[in-house]
Every structure is written in structure tokens, then in C-alpha cells.
Amino acid sequence: LGLSAQLLFVLLLLVMFGMGIQNYRESYGSYEQQKVETDKTLDLIGTPEEDVQMVTNGVKHLGWTVLYYYYPDNEIVNGDYNQAESDRFWYFTPDAMSDEAVAGLQQDGYRVTDYGQMQLAQYPFYLYYIEAVQPASFAKSR
């Protein structure tokens, strides 16, 4: 019984080790993909000036952790684009903006640049840069 129990124990350890290696490979692959996507987003946004707000509309964890980490000098606004108080801001949203919403902003004097689906860490979102084409006083009238 002693030798068969030892062999069974060694076999169990080998199976668990094999499963652990497989889990590590899957996790590492996911981590690498997230890192590539995060770097792409960070390179696109760069270092925004302090008056540029970061507006997030319900993207999980983005508004209260991730954006504060990457953009500590910028104001983070949790809400939709109507709650931005700056005349230029990055808008992170879980769903693409409707054509009507974009047209409404353009009609109100804003330029809307659509960067499509992006990602920070494990959090995907649609990214827009919105800025007033008119003077700031016009932009505040939304």
C-alpha cells in the first residue's frame, strides 16, 4: 500500500502541475493581449493637458480606479458626455455613440473623433475625443 500510495500521490502532483502550466499559459496570453491593447490606448491619448477631462459612462472600474491610475492630473467625470464641464474631453463608453448623438454634438459646435473600440487593462470601451470648435463660453452652454 505504501508504494502504490506514493505513486498515486506523484501522479496526482503531475496532473495538478500540468493543469497549472496550462492555466498559466492561458493567463499569460490574456495578460500579453491586454498589455498590447493598453499600450495602444495610452499611446493614442498621450499625456493630456490638465484641463482635458476624462469622462466615463459606465465602463466597469474605469471611472474609479483605472483612469485615476493612468491620468492622476486630469479630472475624472463619471457620467455621459453631457456631464463634461470642459470644452475638450476623452469619452469612454461601453456602447458606440448613436449617429444622432454625434450629429447633435456637431450641431452644438463640437468636433467628435471616433477611435472605435479600445481597451485599458481588461476593460474594453468605445473611445471618443470631443472638443468644442467654438470658444469655451459656447461650449459651456450645452
Sequence positions of predicted segments:
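Core SAM-dependent methyltransferase catalytic element
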Residues: 120-141
